[in-house]
């Protein structure tokens, strides 16, 4: 087996940044000429995060093949510039589903199905599947979600313990990310949480090879010696992961610490020098803007910024491409109406309405869109944001006062947005069919679909091609019954499915920049290659700000 495996665990508390650490390490190894992939193992019982509340889980990241996955896969794609797939994320729920299906099929020949070996074997097969095929990567980084000590994570930790034994030390590496808090009152770092976390890991049978210490400032050498002594690792295998203002600095910080070099030595990887010119330019451009624009994000999950993680990053990418700083103003759509919209959006150079589900906060989004349209503020609507733009235009420009989505009002005579009952899936070559009674999980129009772009439109100006592929996650779509009526009032449909049956992009050509898309372009934006629509949106905001 040519693939080397790196397992990343976390201790003390959650949200330490395992995903960013894994992505940054992967990026560094990639600059050494190695092929890298990353997989996230989530211990929760949900089959996938598709039906989870964004306030609990954050963003659901959608892959090209239609998997609804953890937001960390967004970090993986952005840092590696390699598309992820459903193979790159699995959960306890998915693992148990597979094992139970096999038991029902009789695959276990009457055996008593247990966590060990059946669940752990299934986990191992998911991990090892990354090393299959001629295009198997040189390195596979496996991030185990949650915190060491969580009862849900025990089968995953047992599985990686077994893999270490089966694959050998030269092919496996265990990295443990832990918190080293700095007590300002005492003026010192505290290592006790790290010691206890490693002790917990050792009790499971896993000896970390490298300890990555999340801290406010770099830890001194005497502290590294202490951690190495108590945690049974080499002193040069204890690294700092310091807080940064710009997350794209993390690979550079790791490189300065010698983190990737130590990993390469321990796994006997080719020790070519990392080529970091592109990362250095990215950070330099990001830290030295030539102006500033303010963009309002109008949503109902704004109290948890992680719910819009890819969106946030895509706007930053657009700023880097335009050499401007993008200040984001999160506005709760439940607090917006026509009477106070001017107050909420005073000083904004762009207004973005993202996706979402359910009626709560929708009228506030519509009020924000009306303000953007009437006041010539650059507007970008994504998924539900596009649908709300259609509703607003129908109500106020096409004399359809009760215009709405079928999702929100079944009694409306002008359902300009309605439930998709069937569509063609070009990947499976099947016609997918749904109705109001279908299961919620995994039943939307998901993944990458082609879009035909109309020449001489804002969209074509951005893409510079007439055919693109974008990622979708929705049940509702524009109702073509109203296409002619809205077109007569000035709306154009600049992007459609190849057969012309589904409206994917809408624009108002008389507006400085007003565009809505049914897909999620933020999932395909990259720090060194901003998505064309985000690049153009921020460019329009820059023009509005007169920067």
Swiss-Prot record:
Pathway: Pyrimidine metabolism; CTP biosynthesis via de novo pathway; CTP from UDP: step 2/2. This is CTP synthase. The gene is pyrG. Residues 294-547 form the Glutamine amidotransferase type-1 domain. It catalyses: UTP + L-glutamine + ATP + H2O = CTP + L-glutamate + ADP + phosphate + 2 H(+); L-glutamine + H2O = L-glutamate + NH4(+); UTP + NH4(+) + ATP = CTP + ADP + phosphate + 2 H(+). CTPSs have evolved a hybrid strategy for distinguishing between UTP and CTP. The overlapping regions of the product feedback inhibitory and substrate sites recognize a common feature in both compounds, the triphosphate moiety. To differentiate isosteric substrate and product pyrimidine rings, an additional pocket far from the expected kinase/ligase catalytic site, specifically recognizes the cytosine and ribose portions of the product inhibitor. Keywords: ATP-binding, Glutamine amidotransferase, Ligase, Magnesium, Metal-binding, Nucleotide-binding, Pyrimidine biosynthesis. Homotetramer.
């Amino acid at each position: 087996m040519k693939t080397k495996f790196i397992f990343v665990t976390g201790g003390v508390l959650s949200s330490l940044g395992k995903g960013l650490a894994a992505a940054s390490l992967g990026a560094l190894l990639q600059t050494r000429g190695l092929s890298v992939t990353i997989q996230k193992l989530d211990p929760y019982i949900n089959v996938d995060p598709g039906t989870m509340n964004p306030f609990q889980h954050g963003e659901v990241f959608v892959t090209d093949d239609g998997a609804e996955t953890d937001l960390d896969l967004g970090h993986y794609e952005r840092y590696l510039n390699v598309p992820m797939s459903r193979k790159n994320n699995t959960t306890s729920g998915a693992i148990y589903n597979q094992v139970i299906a096999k038991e029902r099929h009789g695959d276990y020949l009457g055996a008593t199905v247990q966590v060990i070996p059946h669940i752990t074997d299934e986990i191992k097969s998911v991990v090892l599947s990354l090393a299959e095929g001629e295009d198997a990567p040189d390195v596979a980084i496996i991030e185990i979600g949650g915190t060491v000590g969580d009862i849900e994570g025990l089968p995953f930790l047992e599985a990686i313990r077994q893999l270490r034994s089966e694959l050998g030390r030269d092919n496996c590496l265990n990295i443990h990310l832990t918190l080293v808090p700095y007590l300002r009152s005492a003026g010192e770092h505290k290592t006790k949480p790290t010691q206890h976390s490693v002790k917990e890991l050792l009790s499971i049978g896993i000896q970390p090879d490298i300890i990555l210490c999340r801290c406010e400032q770099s830890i001194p050498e005497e502290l590294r010696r202490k951690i190495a002594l108590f945690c049974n690792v080499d002193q040069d295998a204890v690294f700092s992961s310091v807080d940064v203002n710009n997350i794209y600095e993390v690979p550079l910080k790791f490189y300065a610490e010698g983190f990737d070099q130590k990993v390469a030595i321990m796994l006997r990887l080719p020790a070519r020098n990392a080529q970091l010119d592109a990362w250095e330019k990215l950070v330099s451009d990001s830290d030295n803007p030539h102006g500033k624009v303010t963009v309002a994000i109008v949503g109902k999950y704004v109290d948890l910024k992680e719910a819009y993680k890819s969106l946030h990053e895509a706007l930053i990418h657009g700023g880097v491409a335009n050499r401007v700083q993008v200040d984001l103003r999160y506005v709760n759509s439940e607090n917006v109406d026509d009477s106070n919209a001017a107050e909420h959006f005073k000083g904004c150079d762009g207004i973005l309405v993202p996706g979402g589900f359910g009626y709560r906060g929708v009228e506030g989004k519509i009020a924000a869109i009306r303000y953007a349209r009437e006041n010539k503020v650059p507007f970008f609507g994504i998924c539900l944001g596009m649908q709300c733009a259609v509703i607003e235009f129908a109500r106020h420009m096409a004399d359809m006062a009760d215009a709405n989505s079928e999702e929100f009002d079944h009694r409306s005579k002008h359902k300009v947005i309605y439930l998709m009952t069937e569509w063609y899936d070009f990947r499976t070559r099947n016609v997918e069919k749904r109705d109001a009674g279908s299961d919620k999980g995994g039943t939307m129009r998901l993944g990458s679909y082609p879009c035909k772009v109309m020449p001489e439109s804002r969209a074509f100006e951005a893409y510079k091609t007439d055919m693109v592929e974008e990622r979708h996650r929705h049940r509702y779509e524009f109702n073509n019954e109203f296409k002619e009526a809205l077109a007569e009032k000035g709306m154009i449909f600049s992007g459609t499915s190849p057969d012309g049956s589904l409206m994917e992009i809408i624009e108002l050509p008389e507006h400085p920049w007003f565009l809505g898309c049914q897909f999620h372009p933020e999932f395909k934006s990259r720090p060194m290659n901003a998505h064309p629509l985000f690049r153009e949106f921020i460019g329009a905001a820059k023009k509005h700000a007169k920067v």
